[in-house]
Design a protein with these regions (language model features):
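PRPP-associated nucleotide enzymes
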Residues: 1-185
């Protein structure tokens, strides 16, 4: 993982923003793929969180040669009603969905987003998926970070949730940095 260097507080151009170029995005996705491969985790498919997770999810899908699906999670400004609630991804996670119905085994799912900032998106998924289908299934205690893993381009270590793979690490409790992803310009 890349530690983001201390920024010069006297240089106002870079105090609050860290721009990431398309080339750096490609390098970061390759780093994530290397981490995933080195860990031995082989995803059956990738879930790209809209909107920020779509670009890295597509790139990782190509590198790892696995299919990609999308999940709309928009939690900014309390807009939880703007989220996809589905059953087949949660059912896959515990072995009853699309992938698991033939073998009755849990699917390996890699959830990809641009940044783990506060942890709200990951927390929402961890709450929504068990609630969507089979909420009392005993396997939910074993799903997270085992066969359902999280990857982000940037991980804020002071977040309330943890990711399994990150290309860059920041700590917003020490220095508040806004990441400028190339698709945001």
């Amino acid at each position: 993982m890349i530690e983001i260097p201390d920024l010069d507080y006297h240089n106002r151009e870079y105090v609050d923003h860290l721009p990431i170029s398309w080339d750096e995005l490609d390098q970061d996705c390759n780093k994530l793929a290397e981490q995933i491969t080195a860990s031995g985790f082989v995803p059956d498919y990738i879930v790209g969180i809209t909107r920020g997770g779509l670009t890295p999810a597509v790139i990782l899908s190509q590198i790892l040669k696995v299919p990609m699906y999308t999940l709309k999670v928009s939690l900014r400004d309390g807009a939880e009603e703007d989220c996809d609630h589905n059953c087949w991804m949660p059912e896959d996670a515990i072995g009853y969905g699309k992938m698991g119905c033939l073998e009755d085994t849990p699917a390996n799912i890699l959830i990809v987003d641009d940044i783990n900032d506060s942890g709200t998106t990951i927390a929402w998924i961890k709450q929504d998926w068990p609630g969507a289908c089979l909420p009392n299934h005993a396997y939910w205690n074993e799903v997270w970070h085992k066969n359902v893993k999280f990857a982000t381009l940037v991980d804020n270590t002071s977040s309330n949730e943890q990711v399994d793979y990150a290309a860059r690490v920041i700590d917003k409790s020490k220095k508040d940095i806004w990441i400028d992803f190339p698709w945001e310009r």
